């Protein structure tokens, strides 16, 4: 039996990824700095995730479990920040379609 929820979530992620790039590019046009735009994007995302975390069981107990995580486990945010910033820098120069086509090629 197929589990449709992960399939739908993956499709939603595929739709949201270029949408996020276009939205962040628009924000960059207003703030004038792609790094600031990336920072704002991560702050807003962190707030949204924090709200979601409040609805999980024992959200603050989960933080205690991170004490034994290896250093490499903490670097995912760096990868995300580099990805978002690269996307913001690329979209105005080569467009959304080309940017994400090349991002997929890089995978």
Region spans (language model):
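Membrane-interface interhelical linkers
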Residues: 1-12, 19, 29, 35, ...
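Structural motif at transmembrane-helix junctions in multi-pass transporters
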Residues: 30-33, 86-102
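Hydrophobic/aromatic residues within the transmembrane alpha-helices of Major Facilitator Superfamily
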Residues: 15-19, 47, 78, 105-106
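A generic hydrophobic-segment detector
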Residues: 1, 106-107
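Short, solvent-exposed interaction modules
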Residues: 76-87
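Hydrophobic core positions of alpha-helical segments in small-molecule transporters
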Residues: 40, 102-103
């Amino acid at each position: 039996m197929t589990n449709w929820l992960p399939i739908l979530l993956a499709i939603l992620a595929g739709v949201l990824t270029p949408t996020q790039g276009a939205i962040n590019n628009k924000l960059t046009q207003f703030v004038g700095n792609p790094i600031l735009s990336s920072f704002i994007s991560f702050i807003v995302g962190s707030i949204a995730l924090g709200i979601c975390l409040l609805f999980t069981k024992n959200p603050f107990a989960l933080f205690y479990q991170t004490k034994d995580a290896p250093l490499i486990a903490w670097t995912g945010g760096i990868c995300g920040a580099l990805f978002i910033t690269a996307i913001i820098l690329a979209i105005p120069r080569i467009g959304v379609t080309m940017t994400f086509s090349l991002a997929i090629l890089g995978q």
